[in-house]
């Protein structure tokens, strides 16, 4: 089918060991996962279903609900319906899910976490809820989930924001 061909073609064009695929959207109603290729800046959409295996970075089974925006995943294979066979959290990145002591130096494109400095690149994805935001929207009250490779930040997700109080 055309769907299968598209999925296999995408799988071949995306699947390089060096590629970093950042989850930009998960739609459980349509069973789709959109990923952003950090290396190329290109977005891809994959379908998943009952035959898709979801795994953590150690290879242990998990649920699709354990994958979130900002996670880095590896996607491989396509079944006869063109759905991904395996979606696994990447072991090529580090994750810190509870960052509260941070600051952003916009001039240097640096995120300071505690006493350590990390680079914010042009392709670093920053999420708040379902929105993609920029560093200007981060506040000291936010709690962040940060994903990186060495000293480079790949993605940031605001897990708890300062919010607003509506009276």
Located regions from the model:
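Short, flexible, surface-exposed loop segments at domain boundaries
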Residues: 1-50, 55-122, 127-167
């Amino acid at each position: 089918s055309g769907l299968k061909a598209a999925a296999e073609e995408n799988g071949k064009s995306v699947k390089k060991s060096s590629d970093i695929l950042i989850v930009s959207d998960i739609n459980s109603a349509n069973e789709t996962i959109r990923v952003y290729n950090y290396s190329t800046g290109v977005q891809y959409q994959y379908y998943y279903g009952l035959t898709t295996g979801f795994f953590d970075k150690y290879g242990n089974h998990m649920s699709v609900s354990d994958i979130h925006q900002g996670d880095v995943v590896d996607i491989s294979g396509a079944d006869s319906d063109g759905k991904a066979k395996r979606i696994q959290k990447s072991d090529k990145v580090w994750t810190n899910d509870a960052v509260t002591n941070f600051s952003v130096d916009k001039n240097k494109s640096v995120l300071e976490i505690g006493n350590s400095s990390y680079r914010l690149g042009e392709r670093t994805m920053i999420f708040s809820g379902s929105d993609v935001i920029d560093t200007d929207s981060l506040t000291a009250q936010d709690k962040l989930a940060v994903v990186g490779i060495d000293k480079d930040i790949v993605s940031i997700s605001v897990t708890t924001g300062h919010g607003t109080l509506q009276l």
